[in-house]
């Protein structure tokens, strides 16, 4: 029975959020429907709780009860009033918003972002790529000024003239 209570409380929260789907019904109708639904849920919770179960067993037996159970109507009414207060706030919010989705304006000020610390691995990788680029471009002859190369002469040993 201890596992049943959180389940029922969660189902109440889910039902409250499902009430958002019917946001455009009149306030009186919405409140009446939600009150009926909550009374049914509270009745189920009373029947499924250990005290309510015990009370049902005692009331179904023909003999008078040996143990009297405390009256839970006050506690149920407190819970019901709290839930109805939340529901009335929800309905009031839905009426004032005229069933339109709320659009939040972007913040006027930009948030200050802290300095992002780069790791040493990124620096090493960048240095490796730069050195590799210089090495490959030098071997291809991109750095050479081949004005002095003569195409008639065989200068294969000169790296600058060997690519022409």
UniProtKB/Swiss-Prot annotation:
Highly expressed in segments II-V of the caput epididymis. It is found in: Secreted. Residues 1-23 form the signal peptide. One of its GO terms (cellular component) is extracellular region. Keywords: Secreted, Signal. The keyword Secreted applies. Its main location: secreted. This is Epididymal protein 13. It comes from Mus musculus (Mouse). The lineage of its organism: Eukaryota, Metazoa, Chordata, Craniata, Vertebrata.
């Amino acid at each position: 029975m201890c596992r049943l209570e959180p389940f029922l409380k969660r189902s109440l929260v889910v039902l409250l959020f499902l009430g958002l789907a019917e946001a455009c019904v009149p306030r009186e109708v919405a409140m009446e429907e939600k009150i009926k639904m909550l009374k049914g849920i509270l009745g189920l919770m009373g029947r499924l709780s250990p005290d309510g179960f015990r009370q049902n067993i005692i009331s179904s037996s023909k003999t008078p009860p040996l143990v009297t159970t405390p009256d839970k109507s006050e506690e149920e009414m407190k819970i019901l009033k709290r839930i109805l207060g939340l529901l009335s706030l929800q309905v009031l919010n839905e009426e004032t918003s005229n069933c339109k989705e709320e659009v939040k304006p972007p913040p006027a000020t930009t948030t200050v972002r802290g300095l992002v610390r780069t790791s040493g691995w990124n620096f090493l990788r960048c240095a490796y790529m730069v050195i590799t680029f210089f090495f490959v471009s030098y071997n291809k002859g991109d750095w050479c000024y081949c004005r002095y190369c003569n195409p008639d002469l065989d200068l294969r040993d000169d790296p600058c003239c060997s690519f022409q």
